[in-house]
Amino acid sequence: MAELHLRGWLVSGDGVAIQPVKGRSWGDVIAEEVAKFLNGTWSDYGLGGMCAVHPHCRLRIWYSDFDGTLEEVMEQFDMKLYGGKVESEYHQTGYSEYTSTGIDVDNFTIGGHDLEMELSSHIGEFCHFILETDIE
């Protein structure tokens, strides 16, 4: 399985999860990275748009209030889930997963779920966006 792992802060305004790109939303930047990963291409639909749909994907999104490695965020999530407290400092974490569904980069959806809306509900949080697919 091939994997795309994007990480960064979700911020409002011109900020993006990957890198600052003036005048573009972070949703557009993430969608473009996904299109590149899926070997998608830009198509001219008049206003422009990406043409990349892949039927077999697994998307995991981890959220936290700190800039940590995926392992650190997963550990904090487990502590939250099971009520254990290994460290004295606690961080808020969250997790979403979409499996066996197709991703549509043009509309930035997976299995009919609007990813920009999903990510928008986590503005101000750190995000690990992990897309796995069966492409070679």
Would you name each region that the model predicts?
Residues 1-4, 36, 47, 75, ...:
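Short intrinsically disordered terminal tails
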Residues 1-19:
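Short, extreme N-terminal segment that most often corresponds to the first beta-strand
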Residues 4-10, 79-96:
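Disulfide-bonded cysteine-rich modules in secreted/extracellular proteins
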Residues 10-14, 63-67, 88-90, 107, ...:
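Beta-strand elements of well-folded, non-transmembrane domains
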Residues 18-21, 106:
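A short, exposed loop/beta-hairpin motif centered on an aromatic-Gly-Thr core
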Residues 21-29, 64-68:
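Alpha-helix boundary/N-cap detector
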Residues 39-79, 90-123:
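Acidic, low-complexity, intrinsically disordered interaction modules
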Residues 127-129:
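Short conserved beta-strand and strand-loop elements enriched in small hydrophobics
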